[in-house]
From Swiss-Prot:
GO terms for biological process: inositol catabolic process; L-ascorbic acid biosynthetic process. The lineage of its organism: Eukaryota, Viridiplantae, Streptophyta, Embryophyta, Tracheophyta. Belongs to the myo-inositol oxygenase family. Its cofactor is Fe cation. Fe cation 1 binds at residues 125, 150-151, 282. Fe cation 2 binds at residues 151, 223, 249. This is Inositol oxygenase 5. InterPro entries: Inositol_oxygenase (IPR007828). Its EC number is 1.13.99.1.
Length: 314
């Protein structure tokens, strides 16, 4: 199936806040195709805990202390060798056979301990982000489905999938095999990583070449890369931007800080535009207000049928 993805209209925005309450990003981002102000998704200024989104500086918060401990462990253990072993093991896709919606149901059991903005079950985050995008981009059904499934890889924490520790599943992602950019959250903990002082891996390009394309770069192992492998190897017909979003939505050093762009090729640059669109809804739709699962289920089931086989190997 060939999917035609229309490029969004772009405008330049700064880091101030619009009158609509939407947070502006420091880059050119696509605008939605909705004209009515009362229909668009408005990004809140505070998260569910009454703090700024992605605020990692509040050392008095118990949740923040837990998040920092998570990143200390993650940064220490996510080595090139570890990533290669995980990709080899989970790339077999021999853990389970089920459909996409069954995995959505499983995600009810998952809570992301690295997320400073939400402690709700993952199925609510998935539906909140998907429904927010659906309001603003009603004609991009592939984007709605991408939002629904982007975090399904977090089931790696469940016993059925080997019960991986949180540091091997969630959190911001980054390339391994090259220098750890300082834009990574809690960068100081990389000093405990065995790759940090390895001359093969601690240069800007490391084992890669500039412009090689992110497809050829090994990322820290987690739910992004796992769900990307599941979608790709099971023959999903999602367009390239959808697969790009799935694999790199946690790659905040790239799409927020602009790091690692020397590794990108032209296709990556085009797909990054859609990731910038997606990130607003992924980050700012997190809420304590739940989506009625049964009400929206038929719509998403129709998208699953359109873009995926009935049953997938996981």
């Amino acid at each position: 199936m060939n999917i035609s993805v229309e490029n969004p209209v772009f405008v330049h925005e700064d880091s101030t806040t619009q009158k609509t309450g939407e947070l502006r990003l420091d880059s050119d981002i696509p605008m939605s195709k909705i004209s009515s102000d009362d229909e668009v998704f408005l990004a809140p200024e505070m998260n569910a805990f009454g703090r700024q989104f992605r605020d990692y500086t509040d050392t008095n918060s118990e949740r923040q202390k837990s998040v920092e401990h998570f990143y200390a462990t993650q940064h220490t253990n996510q080595t090139l060798d570890f990533v290669q072993k995980m990709r080899s093991e989970y790339g077999k896709l021999d853990k389970m056979v089920m459909n996409i919606w069954e995995c959505c149901e499983l995600s009810k059991e998952v809570v992301d301990e690295s997320d400073p903005d939400l402690d709700e079950p993952q199925i609510q985050h998935l539906l909140q982000s998907a429904e927010a995008i659906r309001k603003d981009y009603p004609n991009e059904d592939w984007l709605h489905l991408t939002a629904l499934i982007h975090d399904l890889g977090k089931v790696l924490t469940l016993p059925q999938f080997g019960g991986l520790p949180q540091w091997a599943v969630v959190g911001d992602t980054f390339p391994v095999g090259c220098a750890f950019d300082e834009s990574n959250v809690h960068h100081k903990y990389f000093m405990e990583n065995p790759d940090f002082n390895n001359p093969k891996y601690n240069t800007k390009a490391g084992i890669y070449s500039e412009g090689c394309g992110l497809e050829n770069v090994l990322m820290s192992w987690g739910h992004d890369d796992y769900m990307y492998l599941v979608a790709k190897e099971n023959g999903s017909t999602l367009p390239s931007p959808g697969l790009f979003i799935i694999r790199y939505h946690s790659f905040y050093p790239l799409h927020k800080a602009g790091a690692y762009t020397h590794l990108m090729n032209e296709e990556d640059k085009e797909n990054l535009k859609w990731l910038h669109v997606f990130n607003k809804y992924d980050l700012y739709s997190k809420s304590k207000v739940h989506v009625n699962v049964e009400k929206v289920k038929p719509y998403y089931m129709s998208l699953i049928k359109k873009y995926f086989p009935e049953n997938l190997r996981w």
